[in-house]
Amino acid sequence: MEVRVGGKYRLGRKIGSGSFGDIYIGANILTGDEVAIKLESIKSKHPQLLYESKLYKLLAGGIGIPMVHWYGIEGDYNVMVIDLLGPSLEDLFSICNRKLSLKTVLMLADQMLNRIEFVHSKNFIHRDIKPDNFLIGRGKKMSVVYIIDFGLAKKYRDPKTQQHIPYREGKNLTGTARYASINTHLGIEQSRRDDLEALGYVLMYFNRGSLPWQGLKATTKKDKYDKIMEKKMSTPIEILCKHFPFEFITYLNYCRSLRFEDRPDYAYLRRLFKDLFFREGYQYDFIFDWTFINTEKDRASRRSQQVYVEDNRQVEENQNELPM
């Protein structure tokens, strides 16, 4: 039996699941366009889909922000219909044998900084910056990095008065321990600086293949979080970034030097990585490590289906992502 949501969306197969619900592929029955459909039980102890859909609407129109097509209740589920995107950076990292080239890391850093700055400009912090929460687009948008999953996002300042939330301590860890900032581990209320520090750990994860605080043995979740914090605090940034360009050390030192209410200098951080990019002689051509891996898979898939599609390299139209 065909299941429909929102009157015009057909529910297809399950493509993923998270702590708050399941994600299905779907299609607009009028246009045939594919979409992603997120379902959350209305009995959920901590419902977050309505909150997340409101966040997407607030951020709507930003580059690398998926569009919500419909939100509502169907039967026993809260339902959100949203743009269908490509694989996550975690998926692509695995496809690339868990190591990314410096060129790919720097092109990602540029876009990821843009996404985080845009979210911050709308008075919210993400609070769960990790490779799984950045996805690439599909088709013509294959070179665009999208930021997703705003279930843990929090307003850090009043949109009217610009009043920042107060400094607080004794907070539980929100987000993913592997990438959490040291201040988050210490129970300090998160602010803009923490999203950026988390991004620094994501970039080093891509560079190195893993982080020193991965795979630590522990009996309880608290014990594990404590061990991750101890290892993170006792690993000097210079050791974490050893064998990699000094810009990564500069980036993390800068993030850790920010005070709670400070507005980060996003342009400075982008420039830091762009200068390194051009010093290395790279071309800003949006060819990532996975571009040709995917192309080979696509070609095999097309051959098997006996369908010929001209192989075009797509370059993002957005001028904001291009080097100055």
From Swiss-Prot:
The keyword Transmembrane helix does not apply. One of its GO terms (molecular function) is protein serine kinase activity. Disulfide bonds: none annotated. Gene3D superfamilies: Transferase(Phosphotransferase) domain 1. The active site is at 128 (proton acceptor). ATP binds at residues 15-23, 38. Its EC number is 2.7.11.1. InterPro entries: CK1_Ser-Thr_kinase (IPR050235), Kinase-like_dom_sf (IPR011009), Prot_kinase_dom (IPR000719), Protein_kinase_ATP_BS (IPR017441), Ser/Thr_kinase_AS (IPR008271). It catalyses: L-seryl-[protein] + ATP = O-phospho-L-seryl-[protein] + ADP + H(+); L-threonyl-[protein] + ATP = O-phospho-L-threonyl-[protein] + ADP + H(+). The keyword ATP-binding applies. SUPFAM superfamilies: Protein kinase-like (PK-like) (SSF56112). Residues 9-278 form the Protein kinase domain. Pfam families: Pkinase (PF00069). Keywords: ATP-binding, Kinase, Nucleotide-binding, Serine/threonine-protein kinase, Transferase. Casein kinases are operationally defined by their preferential utilization of acidic proteins such as caseins as substrates. It can phosphorylate a large number of proteins. Belongs to the protein kinase superfamily. CK1 Ser/Thr protein kinase family. Casein kinase I subfamily. This is Casein kinase I. It comes from Toxoplasma gondii.
